[in-house]
Amino acid sequence: MVTQNKKILIITGSFGNGHMQVTQSIVNQLNDMNLDHLSVIEHDLFMEAHPILTSICKKWYINSFKYFRNMYKGFYYSRPDKLDKCFYKYYGLNKLINLLIKEKPDLILLTFPTPVMSVLTEQFNINIPVATVMTDYRLHKNWITPYSTRYYVATKETKQDFIDVGIDPSTVKVTGIPIDNKFETPINQKQWLIDNNLDPDKQTILMSAGAFGVSKGFDTMITDILAKSANAQVVMICGKSKELKRSLTAKFKSNENVLILGYTKHMNEWMASSQLMITKPGGITITEGFARCIPMIFLNPAPGQELENALYFEEKGFGKIADTPEEAIKIVASLTNGNEQLTNMISTMEQDKIKYATQTICRDLLDLIGHSSQPQEIYGKVPLYARFFVK
């Protein structure tokens, strides 16, 4: 219980929407708890520190999944000693120091891989609890901050990854990845499909085009899925691509088994009302799908965290990897044409999913902050921050 004024500083990043969504889920949950003595502030560290360079890096990151896969693969799978020498480890250092001086937080929460935090925890006794919410299913070195108080991870296998590299097991909690609470609430699937002019007795295949960053080939995929899966209907989410939505709507306007949508705020309802989803294995998207127990097909995952997430879900029986659209269509046909594999996948997900991750994490954060040092004990010593600038 927080009985005196405390402050949580959340450091996040806008490389993709997932980290921001996790941050918002935690902020919303803490706000819902109506804690008068707690303030929560969030900062997109890299964007605030170097807005122009970070914008360029973000564009490269997004395009790397399509055009620069080998380059990103080389970065992601680099040896730890190479990452330690990379400028990325010091990216945003001055901004981070200034944030700590200005905000004087009682706890720092990382929802984005922030290697620069390691510079502070390794070289200075900042005496502030540091916690990390990991948003993927396999460990990468950039998630590790030496001397952290807590890591919140998705699964027991992720925890073992941390233990294998020497992290104290007592600092790693298996909580699941935090997502919006709406993905935990019941949905009337039949009524949702009826309201959207779809047949609740057919198997609904959900496709998220926005996840792929491309706009070609979906018309053929939809046609082939319907041809090879007799009792299927397809919902295509085109995201912000108006051109794709326009072309697909024109092609399938007379087909009652196809619904073409643009950007939607109802992915929760569509996941809850579908039997299978074709998507990219981003950490938050697949966690939302996991919560809704919808088996997934991962189309041509990019090397790095995408591929590692996909391999984990395939290993656990929650999804399947397809290297090509043709392979994805075959998997859809196999799963929807009467065998028990799809039912078994759903059952496995029901058994293994971790509920209410956001609430669990927020309760633990409050426990950590309740045991943290008093502000004057941390910030009353001027030499602490003076050392940052004379190092």
UniProtKB/Swiss-Prot annotation:
Chief localization: membrane
Q: What pathway or pathways are given for this protein in its record?
A: Glycolipid metabolism; diglucosyl-diacylglycerol biosynthesis
Q: Which Gene3D superfamilies match?
A: Glycogen Phosphorylase B
Biological source species? Staphylococcus aureus (strain NCTC 8325 / PS 47)
User: What protein name applies here?
Assistant: Processive diacylglycerol beta-glucosyltransferase
Name the GO terms of the biological process aspect: enterobacterial common antigen biosynthetic process; glycolipid biosynthetic process; lipoteichoic acid biosynthetic process
Instruction: Name one matching Pfam family.
Output: MGDG_synth
Q: What does this protein do?
A: Processive glucosyltransferase involved in the biosynthesis of both the bilayer- and non-bilayer-forming membrane glucolipids. Is able to successively transfer two glucosyl residues to diacylglycerol (DAG), thereby catalyzing the formation of beta-monoglucosyl-DAG (3-O-(beta-D-glucopyranosyl)-1,2-diacyl-sn-glycerol) and beta-diglucosyl-DAG (3-O-(beta-D-glucopyranosyl-beta-(1->6)-D-glucopyranosyl)-1,2-diacyl-sn-glycerol). Beta-diglucosyl-DAG is the predominant glycolipid found in Bacillales and is also used as a membrane anchor for lipoteichoic acid (LTA).
How is loss of this gene reflected in the phenotype of the organism? Cells lacking this gene are defective in beta-diglucosyl-DAG and are smaller than wild-type. Diacylglycerol (DAG) is the anchor of the LTA in the mutant.
Subcellular location as annotated = Cell membrane
UniProt xrefs under InterPro entries: Diacylglyc_glucosyltr_N (IPR009695), Glyco_trans_28_C (IPR007235), Glycosyltransf_28_UgtP (IPR050519), Pro_diacylglycrl_glcsylTrfase (IPR023589)
Q: What is one cellular component GO term in this UniProt entry? A: plasma membrane
Family, as annotated: Belongs to the glycosyltransferase 28 family. UgtP subfamily.
**What does UniProt report on the pH dependence of this protein?**
Optimum pH is 7.5.
